[in-house]
Amino acid sequence: MDSRYNPATLEEKWQKTWVELGLDKTQTQSNKPKFYALSMFPYPSGSLHMGHVRNYTITDVIARLKRMQGYRVLHPMGWDAFGLPAENAAIDRGVPPAKWTYQNITQMRQQLQRLGLSIDWDSEVATCSPDYYKWTQWIFLQFLQAGLAYQKEAAVNWDPIDQTVLANEQVDNEGRSWRSGAIVERKLLRQWFLKITDYAEELLNDLDKLTGWPERVKLMQANWIGKSSGAYLEFPIVGSNEKIAVYTTRPDTVYGVSYVVLAPEHPLTKQVTTKTQQAAVDTFIQEVTNQSELERTAEDKPKRGIATGGKAINPFTGEEVPIWIADYVLYEYGTGAVMGVPAHDVRDFKFAQRYDLPIDFVIAAPDDVAGFDLSPTSETEEVTQVVQIEYNQAYTEPGILINSGAFTGMTSTDAKQAIVKYATEKGFGKERIQYRLRDWLISRQRYWGAPIPVIHCPNCGIVPVPDKDLPVILPEEVEFTGRGGSPLAQLESWVNVPCPTCGTPAKRETDTMDTFIDSSWYFLRFTDARNEAQVFESAKTNDWMPVDQYVGGIEHAILHLLYSRFFTKVLRDRGLLNFDEPFERLLTQGMVQGLTYFNPNKGGKDKWVPSHLVNPNDPRDPQTGEPLQRLYATMSKSKGNGVAPEDVIAKYGVDTARMFILFKAPPEKDLEWDEADVEGQFRFLNRVWRLVTDYVASGVNPKNKSGELSKSEKDLRRAIHTAIQSVTEDLEDDYQFNTAISELMKLSNALTDANGKDSRVYAEGIKTLVVLLAPFAPHIAEELWRLLGNSESVHTQTWPAFDPAALVADEITLVIQVNGKKRADIQVPSQADKAELEKYARESEVVQRHLEGKEIKKVIVVPGKLVNFVVG
C-alpha cells in the first residue's frame, strides 16, 4: 500500500478497470426507476477547455449519485459535428471537413475519457455521421409531410467578390467579408423555413410546465416568442384602391398618427412613391437593404427614413398623412408597416424630431387633464374641446384620451377595446394576436451540413427523396475554394438526378440544414442510438424521456432549447412521442473565468496580455513596461487567460480538478480560476488519503461491544449521519456541490479528531466518508474503498441513508441571557421542556450573580436555544 497519494497511477488503473467491468453501461432493468442525465454535447473543436470540464463534471456527479441511489441511468455523449469551422479548415488547410472533424472527435474523446466520466460510450453519436443525418433528413421529411416545411425568398449576406453566401459571423463590424474584404450585400435567395410559428402559443403556454427550469431562461424564451395583443388596421392609399395594413399594440393612440412607415422591402413601396421621389427612394432602399437586421434595429443608431411623396388616410380622422420608408421597419415583422405616433413612442418621437414631422399628443396623464371637461354634451355628440397638452418627450404610459373624437375621455384600457370594436364594425380593422417569433430559416448555402432531402423536378415540383434512398450522402469529391457559392451546387454529377416520381431529369436541393436542426433531436437518438431501422423505437424513447437533468450554458437559453421543444412537439404530433417537453430540469452552469491582464493605454486585440508573459507580483506590459490592470474574465484564446485541463490534471490529478470546480462556486455562478484553491483541494484529498490508509495500516478490528455507545461515539455517529443528510440534500435539492464538499470536510475533521479509532462507529465513519466522496472524486474513492477490503466497486454501493435517531444529541448548549446579554452557556439534556430549561438556567452560579438583588419581570424560553431573564 502506497503511503502517498499518487493520482496519475490510480486514475489510469481505475479508468481501465471500469471499462473492463462495464460500470458505465446503461442499465436496462425495468424494475428500476430511470434517470436520464445529459450534458449539452460539444462541437468537436479538437481540445477541451475548462468550461467543458465544468459542464461534464456536474452531470457526472449527478449520474453517479443516481446510480448509487438505485436508478438505471442513461448518461451519453456525442458530437455536434457539422458547422462552419470544418469547412474553413478545408479552405485554409486543404483538409477535408470529414477528416478534420473525425480527427478532432478522436482527440476530444480521449480527453473526455481522461476525465473519468461515467459516460456510456456505446450510445455515442456524431451528427456528421451518415447513420445520424439519415434520420435528420427523415425528420425533415416528416415536417414536409405535415406542411411545416416550405420555401420562400429571404435575404442573405452576399459576398460580391467571392460570389458566395456568408454566415453572420463571417461579416465584420464594418460590414465586410472576413475573407475577401468586400462590402457585403443583402441578396434575396429562395430559402427553406420551418413553421415554428404554428407552435408559438403552445411553446409559450408550456413554459408553465417547466417547474425545474431557471425562471430567467423561461423569461428569455417568453420574450423571444414575444406574444402581444393588439389591432390590425388598414390605411387607404390616396389615389389607389390599395391599403396599407399595420399592426399596433396601441390602438388607443391612433388619433395621434402623423405618418405611416413601410419597410424598404414592402411590395407597396413603388406604388406609393411619386416620380419626383423615385430616384432618392431607390438609392435609400439600396443602402438599407445591404445592412444587416442588427444594424437596422440597433437602439444606439439614429433611425433613417425617406418620404415617398405618397399619402395615406387615417381611417379614424379622414386626414391624410405622409407615407415614409424607414430602416427600422422590417418586412418580416408584423405586416412590414407601422403607424408613426411620435407623441407616444420613443423611437417615433426621435424620428419625427429628425425629419420635422408633427407630434400630436392624444393621451395625457390623468392629473394633467383634471381641469378639463371631457364629457360629451349628449350620447350622439363627440367631445369637441381641444386639449392643448404637450410634453418634452414621448408620453408612453397609459392615460386619458384627448383630442380623439368619440373616444376622448376614455382610459387607454377602455379606448383600446372601443377603438378595435369600432374598426371591426366599420371593416377597416380587427383584433389580432401577434408574435415576435418568426419561422425558422434553416437553409445554409454550405457544404458541411445535412443535405436537405428534396429534388426539384420541372414537372412534379418539390419531390421528397424516398425513405429508401436516405441518407442523401455528402459527396467527397468537392473542391473548397471559398468562392462561387455552395460547393454542392458546383458538383453536377451530384446535383443532376432523375425525378423519383416521373423519371424526368431533375436537380437535387443544394442547400444544407442549419446545424441547430442536428441538435434539436440528438437527445432522442441517444435513447436508441444503434437503431438502423428507424429514427428510434418509440417505446424505448418514451421510456427514457424526458431528460431528467439537462446541463449546459446560458448561451443556449433561447435558440437550442426552443428548437428542441419545437421538435419534440412536432414529433409528438406525428405519433412518435407521448410527452410534451424534452427537458424536465435544466441547470445552466456559469462560465469559468481566468485572471486577465490588460493595458488600459491600448485597445482592441493589443489590449490583452497573455498571463504566461506576466509576472503576477509586478504585472507589466512586456513590450512597453507599462503597468497592467487585472480582472477576471471568461477564459478565451484572445485574452490569453486560459488554463489547459491537461496541465491541471498532469499536476494534480482529475479528482482534484473535479473537486475544485465543484467547490469553488455554486454551479449556476461564474467560477474564478485560482490555483491556490486547486492546491487546497489537493491537500484535502491527501488528508483523506492519509486518514484512510493510516486506518487500514493500523490493522484494527472494530470492536462490536454491547451496550450504550459512549458520548464520543454518539458525537461521531451524529457527525456521520449529519454528513449523510446534508450531502444528500445538497445534491438532490439544488445541486449545491460546494456545500456538500464542505460537509465532507467536516466529516473528515471529525474522524481525524475522534477518539476510539478501533470502534465500530469509527469504521462506519471511514466507510461513509469514502462512499460520500465517490461521486465527486471517483478515482481516489475507488482506491480507498478497495483498500478497506471491499471486492466490489464503490460506485455499485447503495447510497447511505441517514438515521434520524443518530442526529439527536443527548445534550445541547443552552445560552443564558440577562436583559438580552449573554451571561453563560451550559449543557442541558436535549429533551428538557421549557420548565426544566428555566430551572437549569436559574441553577447556574454565573447567572445567579447577575440576578442577585434584582426583580425578574419576565422569563423568555426558546426551546433548544436560550433562556432570557428580563430584570428590573
From Swiss-Prot:
Enzyme class: ligase
InterPro entries, alphabetized: aa-tRNA-synth_I_CS, aa-tRNA-synth_Ia, Leu-tRNA-ligase, Leu_tRNA-synth_edit, M/V/L/I-tRNA-synth_anticd-bd, Methionyl/Leucyl_tRNA_Synth, Rossmann-like_a/b/a_fold, tRNAsynth_Ia_anticodon-bd
Residues the record lists as binding ATP: K637
Motif 'HIGH' region, residue numbers: 42-52
Subcellular location: Cytoplasm
Keywords: Aminoacyl-tRNA synthetase, ATP-binding, Cytoplasm, Ligase, Nucleotide-binding, Protein biosynthesis
GO cellular component entries: cytosol
Any GO BP annotation: leucyl-tRNA aminoacylation
N-terminal signal peptide: none
First-listed, main subcellular location of the protein, grouped into a coarse class: cytoplasm
Segments carrying motif 'KMSKS' region: 634-638
Family: Belongs to the class-I aminoacyl-tRNA synthetase family.
UniProt-listed NCBIfam families: leuS_bact (TIGR00396)
Stated name of the protein: Leucine--tRNA ligase
Native source organism of the sequence: Nostoc sp. (strain PCC 7120 / SAG 25.82 / UTEX 2576)
Gene: leuS
